[in-house]
């Protein structure tokens, strides 16, 4: 599939001009679109992003972001339903040595199903599990996993 996944970190960096990765993530998103590639995200990522923008940047910024992505012909939302949810749960257990969010695991499950290899994000976890990350800059530090 000629598409690139966009994770919460990528969306947040694009939305927040004060984010250190703003220019790089915006450039990666724009280059992806200019190359004629589709952006793909999930309902879980949209939920997480909308909530983060709302609490970090305010309700007006959240509404602006929503209007920009809602109905875009260049963006496809994938729903995390029963089978995908179960695959994400299995990944959540499989990667117990990493400090992952469940939303990360839902993204991994969808990306694998759709055979997507590239993601726009600031989250280093995607690189840790084998995906190509845009922008190709050093990822933000991730927390040290807790021992179970």
Go through each PLM region and give its residues.
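Acidic, PIN/NYN-like endoribonuclease modules and their adjacent C-terminal/linker elements
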Residues: 108, 112-148
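Active-site neighborhoods of divalent-metal-dependent phosphate/nucleic-acid chemistry enzymes
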Residues: 75-118
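Structured helix-beta-strand junction loops
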Residues: 35-36, 72-73, 129
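Alpha-helical structural signal
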Residues: 29, 46, 66, 104-107
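Short, well-structured N-terminal submotif of metal-dependent ribonuclease cores
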Residues: 1-41, 54-68, 135-147
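Short secondary-structure boundary segments
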Residues: 43-44, 104, 123-124
